[in-house]
UniProtKB/Swiss-Prot annotation:
Side of membrane Cytoplasmic, spans: 1-11, 200-686
Single GO BP term: proteolysis
Coiled-coil intervals, chain numbering: none
Protein name as catalogued: ATP-dependent zinc metalloprotease FtsH 2
Record flagged with keyword Transmembrane: yes
Family indicated by similarity: In the central section; belongs to the AAA ATPase family. In the C-terminal section; belongs to the peptidase M41 family.
Subcellular location: Cell membrane
EC identifiers of the protein: 3.4.24.-
UniProt lineage: Bacteria, Bacillati, Mycoplasmatota, Mollicutes, Acholeplasmatales
PANTHER family on file: ATP-DEPENDENT ZINC METALLOPROTEASE YME1L1, METALLOPROTEASE M41 FTSH
Length: 686
């Protein structure tokens, strides 16, 4: 806001000029209006009277001149009296259909002549004008012939001169009154001036950017002294916090390390999947050390103008040196640090920006007290010169939170929310493997919104369960209704996944089965691994593929027909099988990696055929295994499908009851209670 006000005052000269120009235009219009009102004092009827008088004098003068000419034929002196209209002019004004008539007349002879009067009559209407023209014809004395070809006002005046003894007319300069037209024109001129001014100003700024003279540091968000955000505001990541404490100690006591001859790391690279808290961790380091924090994005330095990115890098580091000790945090650093010479990122602007970053981090100049932290999701794409020691010395892989960390994150985000006493964050943490911190926060926020929608003061387990489904699959499609055949097929499809999960030892545990449509899915199974591990065995991967194919196998076994509802299952199953063959070495092709991208692959076309055969072999094996398990456990499949058609959603506890007793106890009791109430009601009606 301050900057906008400053710009307004800076450019105030152009606005002052326009204001004065408009004021003068308005003043001119008002003055001309007053003059016009003064002219209006002469009534148009007066000119008619004057013209009639001219006509009479002309007639009388003509008769007298004839008489005198007879009496003084012998005299050569010409004493003929004539009537002279010195000035006679008619103008059509700016107002359509009105006229201005100006004339000056008098009588006399050639030796002596006295002027009588000069009159101006503005704004004469058409009716009066016609009457004046009629008298003018009479003054002429002869009618205007068609051969005279009079088509306009000026020709009329010329004929009056030709057919009378009037002295040649003298045109009177006249500035007509145009109303407020001059003011409107002035407004348009001012608008054009302002438009051209801003266009010129924009061109000037662009030229300054190209020349590197106008590099605004406002692109970089400088957050000074972030004491309010520290490690206490970050849950989990205990190992990363411990490693970062060394940087914090250096920022607080840099001379201690210099006295020992130790070189503090110049840069710290944080890499990992999205949403794990890389930016928050860097911000917390600055808050713990209580130093300025420069937060920028890699895209801030890339422009169409060559050299502008490098200039912004210099500007950023110069500003950081003035505020040392401090932290520069570059988010999405792969934007400016991709490997030079690669096909996708080979251009002079990218290379110049990267070279300038390399020089600033470890070049001829020293950046004492300036630590560079960067975050990326693609560490493999970074240029080797960036990741070498001396630039980014420390590399921290920020992984997805463990069960313990997820529980801590949930409790952290639950501090400002009210939950029911039966809400168990430990259980929720176990239900969310592979979730990052952002997703966990979204679950609790969504549950709070659902509770508010129900007009309750506390969040219960039902809200959290619904929020989890929303984050995973989207909101339920209540308007989407199945017919009986479709609903039965969806129930058996989801039951097929559940049977594989219950009967295959290496498969993931089933937490929930539902046939309520969400997003593009007609239903889904929520599964959890039996335990969180860093590695997956071949048996476990085959079990996952078998589980994905369980829905299609159930459709084929029960209906001898299949639907397109398994398209996403095939996608995930094929991805796992392809990785087993090309990356993990879990096929008959042996422990070899077959890598490919849009421009390169390290295997031949004949080998690609073999890879496809191996993938097909794995898929066929798992599908036959799924059909076998479904066929052997048809009774269990029918039971789960039956309850899905009735309840629509079955939990892990319900599945265990079906597996052990063949029924869901709470549902059977509820049905029995409803049947009794219905019977009692019918008896009362009888």
């Amino acid at each position: 806001m301050k900057k906008n006000i400053k710009d307004i005052f800076k450019n105030f000269n152009i606005f002052w000029f326009c204001f004065i120009f408009l004021l003068l235009s308005l003043l001119y219009c008002l003055i001309m209006m007053e003059i016009s009102h003064q002219h209006d004092n002469n009534k148009p009827s007066e000119i008619i009277a004057v013209l009639k008088e001219i006509k009479e004098l002309q007639t009388k003068s003509t008769e007298e001149s004839k008489k005198e000419s007879k009496e003084s034929k012998e005299s050569k002196e010409d004493k003929t009296k004539i009537i002279k209209i010195k000035k006679f002019d008619i103008h059509e004004t700016s107002n359509y259909g009105s006229y201005l008539i100006v004339f000056q007349w008098g009588t006399g002879n050639k030796d002596s002549f006295e002027w009588e009067k000069e009159l101006k009559f503005p704004n004469v209407d058409q009716e009066t004008y016609k009457e004046i023209m009629k008298i003018c014809f009479e003054i002429i004395g002869t009618p205007i012939d068609k051969k005279d070809n009079i088509t306009n006002l000026s020709q009329m005046i010329t004929k009056i001169k030709e057919k009378t003894n009037l002295i040649p007319l003298q045109r009177i300069p006249y500035q007509p009154y145009f109303g407020f037209a001059p003011f409107i024109s002035a407004v348009n001129i001012c608008i054009l001036i302002i438009i051209f001014y801003f266009i010129y100003n924009s061109i000037e700024k662009t030229s300054a950017q190209i020349s590197g003279k106008n590099l605004n540091i406002s692109r970089q968000k400088v957050l000074v002294n972030q004491q309010e955000f520290t490690f206490k505001d970050i849950a989990g990541a205990d190992e990363e916090k411990e490693e970062m404490s060394e940087l914090i100690n250096f920022l607080k006591n840099p001379f201690k390390y210099e006295a020992m001859g130790a070189r503090i790391p110049k840069g710290v690279l944080l890499y990992g999947p999205p949403g794990v808290g890389k930016t928050l961790l860097a911000k917390a380091v600055a808050g713990e050390a209580k130093v300025p924090f420069f937060a920028v994005s890699g895209s801030d330095f890339i422009e169409v103008y060559v050299g502008l990115g490098a200039s912004r890098i210099r500007k950023l580091f110069n500003e950081a040196k003035q505020n040392a000790p401090c932290i520069i945090f570059i988010d999405e650093i792969e934007t400016i640090s991709h490997q030079r010479g690669s096909v996708n990122y080979s251009n002079s602007e990218h290379d110049q920006t990267l070279n300038q970053l390399l020089v600033e981090m470890d070049g001829f100049t020293k950046n004492i007290g300036v630590i560079v932290m960067a975050a990326t999701n693609q560490p493999e794409s970074l240029d080797l010169a960036v990741t070498r020691p001396g630039r980014f010395d420390r590399h921290f892989h920020i992984t997805l939170p463990s069960v313990k960390d997820r529980e801590a994150i949930l409790k952290l985000h639950a501090r400002n929310k009210k939950f029911n006493d039966d809400v168990d964050f430990e259980s929720l943490a176990k239900q969310t493997p592979g979730f990052n911190g952002a997703q966990l926060e979204a679950i609790l926020n969504e549950s709070a919104l659902l509770a508010t929608r129900r007009n309750v003061l506390v969040i219960c387990n039902e809200d959290i369960s619904e929020a989890l489904d929303r984050v995973l699959m989207g909101p339920s499609k209540k308007s989407k209704k199945y017919n009986d055949k479709e609903k039965r097929m969806v129930a058996y499809h989801e039951s097929g996944h559940a049977v594989i999960g219950l009967k295959l030892p290496e498969a993931d545990q089933i937490q929930k089965v539902t046939i309520i449509p969400r997003g593009n899915a007609g239903g889904y199974n929520l599964t959890l691994p039996q335990e969180e591990t860093f590695f997956s065995s071949k048996k476990r991967l085959l079990a996952q593929i078998t589980s994905f194919l369980g829905g299609r196998a159930a459709e084929e076994v029960v209906f001898q027909d299949v639907s397109n509802g398994a398209y996403s299952d095939f996608k995930y199953a094929t991805e796992i099988a392809k990785k087993m063959v090309t990356q993990y070495g879990m096929s008959d092709l042996g422990p070899i990696q077959y890598m490919e991208n849009n421009f390169y692959k390290n295997f031949s076309d004949s080998k690609a055929v073999e890879i496809d055969k191996e993938i097909q072999k794995i898929i066929d094996y798992c599908y036959q295994n799924a059909k076998k398990i479904i066929t052997e456990n048809r009774d269990l499949l029918d039971l789960i499908s039956k309850y899905l058609l009735e309840i629509e959603t079955i939990t892990q506890k319900d599945l265990e009851e079906i597996l052990n007793t063949g029924i869901i106890e709470w549902w059977e009791k509820d049905k029995l209670k409803k049947n009794l109430q219905k019977s009692e009601k019918e008896d009362c009606n009888k």
